[in-house]
Amino acid sequence: MIGRITGTLIEKLPPTICVDVNGLGYDIEVPMSTLYALPELGARVTLHTHLTVREDAHILYGFATAAERGAFRELIKVSGIGARTALSVLSGLSVSDLAQAITLQESGRLTRVPGIGKKTAERLLLEMRGKLGADIGATAHAVPDSQTDILNALLALGYSDKESQAALKKLPEGTGVSEGIRLALKALVR
């Protein structure tokens, strides 16, 4: 098993990158979150990896953090979730957001990810309950109810999870739901 790769980033063709390790180029599939975290071409990178061996291919998946790789490994254990769908989930949600959605049993957050329908989201929540949240302490970092309501409102209005989370962080502590939505929308429009 190839657990980690360090080398020079020589190509970015989403969702695949190529890392040169001593003259050998490794094609690695990465979630968009990892792709955005990568430095410019020619820079040195280290990725935590997962190797999938199939009859017709050996595919290397790369992640910026060990937590992301761990989440990927848990996701592909869920029936109906393959590697592509797992990458899609990690592209749409951070590991902490995924753990929080699992802990709070929020299927709505999962169904916003391409390739995840209502039944798949419910199965994912059921099969992953207690597996991911315990690893990163999602229950300790659970968002208060008003913030969850604000986040859900922003997501329903079509803003991405990343944009919505960024707007939430800018809100003053203890902001009510209606005031929070108003302030968040104001911040997002700028």
From Swiss-Prot:
Chain positions covered by the region annotation Flexible linker: 137-141
Gene Ontology terms, MF aspect: ATP binding; four-way junction DNA binding; four-way junction helicase activity
InterPro entries: DNA_helicase_Holl-junc_RuvA_I, Hlx-hairpin-Hlx_DNA-bd_motif, NA-bd_OB-fold, RuvA, RuvA_2-like, RuvA_C, RuvA_C_sf
Alphabetical keyword list: Cytoplasm, DNA damage, DNA recombination, DNA repair, DNA-binding
GO biological process, one term: DNA repair
Localization per Swiss-Prot or TrEMBL: Cytoplasm
Region (Domain II): 65-137
Subunit description: Homotetramer. Forms an RuvA(8)-RuvB(12)-Holliday junction (HJ) complex. HJ DNA is sandwiched between 2 RuvA tetramers; dsDNA enters through RuvA and exits via RuvB. An RuvB hexamer assembles on each DNA strand where it exits the tetramer. Each RuvB hexamer is contacted by two RuvA subunits (via domain III) on 2 adjacent RuvB subunits; this complex drives branch migration. In the full resolvosome a probable DNA-RuvA(4)-RuvB(12)-RuvC(2) complex forms which resolves the HJ.
Function: The RuvA-RuvB-RuvC complex processes Holliday junction (HJ) DNA during genetic recombination and DNA repair, while the RuvA-RuvB complex plays an important role in the rescue of blocked DNA replication forks via replication fork reversal (RFR). RuvA specifically binds to HJ cruciform DNA, conferring on it an open structure. The RuvB hexamer acts as an ATP-dependent pump, pulling dsDNA into and through the RuvAB complex. HJ branch migration allows RuvC to scan DNA until it finds its consensus sequence, where it cleaves and resolves the cruciform DNA.
Entry remark concerning the domains of this protein: Has three domains with a flexible linker between the domains II and III and assumes an 'L' shape. Domain III is highly mobile and contacts RuvB.
Protein name according to UniProt: Holliday junction branch migration complex subunit RuvA
